[in-house]
């Protein structure tokens, strides 16, 4: 984020205000790419890990169901994305935070993923830590897919 803010400040020839920093954060980390919104998820833990069914999409795209298995919810989603996209996506950094002090607190997840030497980062806010983690991975994956599509065009 610091590099992005510094770049904006250099382009504008000076300092930028907190409103602009907030806008940059929203557009570069928090906004969900079209078609990559978490609609629902269903997780089942068994002897072989977590089996996940994750529905994604938005009002502009049909719902897609991703299925995967992993050690946890994030691992299952990564496995499903790798199969669907033909990637070897890896999670390089992952942090979760509670945004409050009680059981009604929202959650925030921050991720950085890598595919073929290229990285994307994303942040997600949700009512629970699992939804925040899944949405952050989906947002980063969506940004990766968009970057690959631009590169191939």
Model-derived segments and spans:
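Terminal or standalone catalytic/regulatory effector modules within metabolic enzymes
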Residues: 1-153
